[in-house]
């Protein structure tokens, strides 16, 4: 898939506006735990462009390093998502409490520039918003493009489309499903190591009787995946399910999803099984392993993800 363009030329833009870094309250990135909030400051650059500084922990309990010494690409995806929420709240005035509904999310990580050291990694996330539609003076939908630099080197790019809805509109849209509820897994996890995890509590898949198909496990007490009461399965949990399914179908060789593209079609509900299926596909280039992952619930497509990563030996 194509990478997002590099959006901000830091050298040419450095003197165009007053450069004052602004702090990031956790509410603006929809997190309640400081260890799960990655943007730390932001600067408006003008013309629907922003620069966000983010820090990546080297020892996050959920977004742990992959393949021994690389930052998890899904940690990058989550950082991009938080940077987008930040600029729409702080830069455009979308009220806190509005729902941030992502329809697509694509990313490309350059693993050579995402090595893990003994300290936090500081990233500069360039954010550009486009195709904005406004209602009542604030955006209701748009496209976001990101370019991530670490020590001046391009470490990742991404693009997404998203919508924003008020609590009132969201409740009407969700109807009987709008009430947050709890979910406790009633099925055993697949072995953590086979799913690319080290802890059973982070495994979101259970075995099924069908080949290369697993049942989604949802535990609303998970401290990272569920920061607050929710009425549906979060998109980042679905991305994690896709990653784990890719690990299972490509194992025993490790799978690192350095490239990902996801289309979210409908909500995954708590009250019905969601089935995750993975298929190895021809890769976009030599040396890459590609997996197509789908989620279905009650016979309908919930999401479609394509993940690619370096072909490692087992």
Swiss-Prot record:
Disruption phenotype: Deletion of the gene leads to a strong perturbation in the expression of three pigmented antibiotic clusters. It also affects the secondary metabolite cluster responsible for synthesis of the siderophore desferrioxamine and expression of the genes encoding enzymes for primary metabolism pathways, which supply antibiotic precursors and genes for morphological differentiation.
A GO MF term: transferase activity
Keywords: Transferase
Enzyme class: transferase
EC number(s) per entry: 2.3.1.277
Claim: S-adenosyl-L-methionine is one of the keywords in the record: no
Recorded catalytic activity of this chain's protein: a medium-chain 3-oxoacyl-[ACP] + dihydroxyacetone phosphate = a (4-alkanoyl-5-oxo-2,5-dihydrofuran-3-yl)methyl phosphate + holo-[ACP] + H2O
Signal peptide location: none
Name of a matching Pfam family: AfsA
The keyword Transferase is annotated on this UniProt entry: yes
General function of this protein: Involved of the biosynthesis of S.coelicolor butanolide 1 (SCB1), a gamma-butyrolactone that triggers antibiotic production.
NCBIfam families documented for this protein: ScbA_BarX_GamBu (NF041195)
Family membership noted in the UniProt record: Belongs to the AfsA family.
Protein's name in the database: 2-oxo-3-(phosphooxy)propyl 3-oxoalkanoate synthase
Organism for this UniProt entry: Streptomyces coelicolor (strain ATCC BAA-471 / A3(2) / M145)
Gene (name only): scbA
